[in-house]
Each structure stands twice: as C-alpha cells, then as structure tokens.
Amino acid sequence: MIVIPAIDLREGRCVRLFRGDFARATVYSDDPIEMAQRWASAGARWLHVVDLDGARLGQPVQHELIERVIRAVPDVAVQVGGGVRTLDAVERLLVGGAARVVIGTAALERPDMLREALARFGVERVVVAVDSRDGWVATHGWETVQAIRVEEVVHRVVLLGVRRVLATDVTRDGTLTRPNLELMGRLAALGVTVIASGGVGSRSDLEALARVPGVEAAIVGRALYEGRVRFERPEDWVIGAEAA
C-alpha cells in the first residue's frame, strides 16, 4: 500500500480541516510548493492536492498554484481534486501535469459527464471521490449530506466503468482516531480499488489499512504534518506486501 501525503490548499496556503469543517482549519504552511518539495525530498511517490476553495465554489480556483506545485516536483505523480465538475476542468488539470484527477460531486450529479471523462481521458486518470458522514454521501465541499448511502454511489460509478475511488470518512478526517477499516473493506468488495482517507494517526493505522483487501493507497495529512508518522526514504512510503 502506498502512502500519499495530502496538500490541501485554501487561499494559497497549506491547511488541514477537522472533520471537513472549514471553520476548523489549521494552517501548516504558507508555502505549498516548499511543502510539496519537502515530501518529494523524503521520497514520496505521489502527492494528493486538493483545491478546498474550489470544492466549496464548485469550480477550481487555484489552477496556477496547483500547476506550480506540479512543476516543482517533476519526479512525483500528483493527483488533484476540488471543484472538478466539468470536462474542461478535468482536461485543464491533466494538461497542467496532473497524473490523475479526482471527481466528486459531479460523479453523483452528472453521471454523463463522468462517463465522458472516462472515455476521453481513460479510467486510470480519473478517480471518483466518495465522501461520507456516518455512511451517507457528503458533497459540495463536504457541506451537504445526501440521502444516499456511499455503497450505492460506488455501485453506480462501477457500472459506468470507474476502477478507482477515493474514500473519505469525513467524520474521522483530521482526527487521528484510526481509519474506518470496515467502510474501506465494504467499498473495495464492490469491485473497485480504494484510496483510503481519514483518521490515520500512526504507523499501526497504516499497517491495518494495508491489510484490507483492495486498499491500494492511503492519504495522510495531519499525522505527517505533526510528526506522528515519519518517512525519510522512498521505501518508507510503501507499507505491507509491496514493500518487499
């Protein structure tokens, strides 16, 4: 399982939210580019960059900064999300150097757009974000809870051809209280590869996630920024069987 550091952008700074609450944001750096280079120097293979302002507004607003981050780490693959709700937004991010683009709200509200994105850009370059609060889907920057279970959304997008989902338990995001292993396992059992997010607070949490069949990667934010988990070599960023 690959560990992916998170770089969440809000008003040009690197922040972390607590349980998806924009009113409870902690600023970890005023220089996201320096932060990206820090993780790259430590051997990270991937970065996960989120435009939080874009997620709230429904369209990416930090394109230029994101492209600068991508250019600053040429040897690292960068996955980008936040407010990606049109084909033009997907294309611009990919042209700007993103290795993968994450589609969230639009995957539920605009399935035809998702289908076209998969056809035009390829299933390996499109990831669907499924964010949940107590099992219910959270959309529009995690501020709206929909009357649909997260498993149903995954089932729908699998039928459209999606192969990889980014699953976040918003109630655990930024809490360091252990990932929702049961949720990740249930979603992986639906026939997708899972990138897990939310709740990682220690290396033992990562080892537990690595044992869940179908979990390919884990996104880690606060635990890295506060030094609860430390990685200094490329091999440190791989947990479990793949490290052999």
From Swiss-Prot:
The pathway where this protein functions is: Amino-acid biosynthesis; L-histidine biosynthesis; L-histidine from 5-phospho-alpha-D-ribose 1-diphosphate: step 4/9
The enzyme's first-digit EC class, named in words, is isomerase
Main localization of the protein described in the UniProt heading: cytoplasm
Q: Which InterPro entries match?
A: Aldolase_TIM (IPR013785), His_biosynth (IPR006062), HisA_bact_arch (IPR006063), Isoase_HisA-like (IPR044524), Isoase_HisA-like_bact (IPR023016), RibuloseP-bd_barrel (IPR011060)
The entry's cellular-component GO terms read: cytoplasm
Annotated EC: 5.3.1.16
Task: Note the Gene3D superfamilies from the entry.
Answer: Aldolase class I
Q: What positions does UniProt annotate as the active site of this protein?
A: D8 (proton acceptor), D131 (proton donor)
Q: Where in the cell is it found?
A: Cytoplasm
Q: Which GO terms describe its biological process?
A: L-histidine biosynthetic process; L-tryptophan biosynthetic process
> Which GO terms fall under molecular function for this chain's record?
1-(5-phosphoribosyl)-5-[(5-phosphoribosylamino)methylideneamino]imidazole-4-carboxamide isomerase activity
* Reactions listed under catalytic activity: 1-(5-phospho-beta-D-ribosyl)-5-[(5-phospho-beta-D-ribosylamino)methylideneamino]imidazole-4-carboxamide = 5-[(5-phospho-1-deoxy-D-ribulos-1-ylimino)methylamino]-1-(5-phospho-beta-D-ribosyl)imidazole-4-carboxamide
Q: Which domain of life is it from?
A: Bacteria
Kindly state which keywords UniProt assigns to this record, in alphabetical order.
Answer: Amino-acid biosynthesis, Cytoplasm, Histidine biosynthesis, Isomerase
UniProt KW Cytoplasm keyword:
yes
Q: Which Pfam families match?
A: His_biosynth (PF00977)
What family is this protein classified in? Belongs to the HisA/HisF family.
Against HAMAP family, the record matches this protein to:
HisA
Per its UniProt record, what PANTHER family does this chain match? 1-(5-PHOSPHORIBOSYL)-5-[(5-PHOSPHORIBOSYLAMINO)METHYLIDENEAMINO] IMIDAZOLE-4-CARBOXAMIDE ISOMERASE
Protein name per UniProt: 1-(5-phosphoribosyl)-5-[(5-phosphoribosylamino)methylideneamino] imidazole-4-carboxamide isomerase
